[in-house]
């Protein structure tokens, strides 16, 4: 597709976690075209950033990846299964999905919230959690750096702590794919940096895990992010390795204003306008 950055490692026969071919989505009520001609492949161990202005189609695209909706045209394969030819309930159980809008009972402890990831429920199903499952929930809290929150009510945890608890919850099913929908939303600087570090360590410890992170801010990308896809008005503007995609010209086109990008020690930043 014109405007896309080719990935030299792409091979149609490679193993894929996600494979989208000529995907389009129209809004049923208005026939508005939301996504158009999306081609995209994500492989094990790749960590993608999904960026675009408000209304570019990021939320709709993430819903497709999470098997929460079907495309109007084209094909979507998630974890080797084509949407429309698979029981999406079983498929969703193999996908980790984290969003700040998740419904979580505020009085549950952090450990109980993580346990609900095993049963895929909002409320705990205590009889289904044996000692091994409970121990795994503790291990995931430790892996995300929040083991001290195990007995703390979720409702009194900070925004950054909640984000890490929800990621631990998503990992209970040992997914091959982790979708993160603006996980840094409303976090202060220390909480953002704690989550960036936690995600970087998570990626290092799980070499086969693939992630897709929706964000508006390059500063939120953890160093292990290897690829990026830019959406503009429902179409892919560019995709591929971060070095070739997160550039001044492409981000300027993506967001419609002059943007300057910098990278230091594996971390990205961007600003718009003149330096003062």
Feature-to-residue mapping (PLM):
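The feature captures the beta-strand-to-loop junction immediately N-terminal to the Walker
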Residues: 51-53
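H-loop (His-switch) and adjacent beta-strand-loop-beta switch element
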Residues: 228-241
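Catalytic Walker B motif of ABC-type/P-loop ATPase nucleotide-binding domains
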Residues: 178-182
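Conserved catalytic motifs of ABC-family nucleotide-binding domains
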Residues: 174
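Helix-to-loop junction immediately C-terminal to a conserved catalytic motif
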Residues: 66
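Conserved ABC ATPase signature
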Residues: 153-157
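Conserved ABC transporter NBD signature motif
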Residues: 74-84
């Amino acid at each position: 597709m014109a405007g896309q950055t080719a990935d030299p490692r792409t091979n149609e026969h490679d193993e894929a976690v996600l494979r989208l071919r000529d995907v389009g989505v129209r809004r049923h009520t208005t026939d508005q075209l939301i996504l158009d001609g999306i081609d995209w492949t994500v492989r094990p161990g790749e960590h993608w950033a999904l960026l675009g202005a408000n209304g570019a189609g990021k939320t709709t695209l993430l819903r497709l990846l999470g098997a929460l909706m079907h495309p109007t045209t084209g094909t979507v394969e998630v974890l080797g299964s084509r949407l429309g030819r698979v029981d999406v309930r079983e498929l969703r159980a193999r996908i980790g999905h984290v969003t700040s809008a998740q419904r979580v009972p505020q009085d549950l402890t952090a450990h109980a919230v993580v346990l609900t990831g095993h049963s895929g429920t909002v409320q705990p199903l205590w009889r289904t959690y044996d000692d091994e499952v409970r121990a795994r929930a503790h291990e995931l809290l430790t892996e995300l750096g929040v083991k001290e929150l195990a007995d703390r009510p979720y409702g009194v945890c900070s925004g950054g702590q909640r984000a890490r608890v929800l990621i631990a919850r998503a990992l209970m099913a040992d997914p091959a794919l982790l979708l993160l929908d603006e996980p840094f939303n409303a976090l202060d600087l220390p909480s953002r940096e704690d989550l960036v570090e936690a995600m970087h360590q998570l990626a290092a410890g799980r070499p086969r895990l693939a992630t897709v992170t929706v964000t508006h801010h390059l500063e939120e990308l953890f160093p292990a992010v290897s690829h990026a896809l830019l959406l503009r008005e429902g179409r892919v503007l560019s995709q591929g390795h971060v070095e070739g995609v997160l550039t001044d010209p492409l981000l300027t086109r993506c967001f419609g204003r002059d943007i300057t990008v910098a990278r230091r020690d594996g971390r990205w930043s961007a600003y718009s306008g003149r330096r003062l």
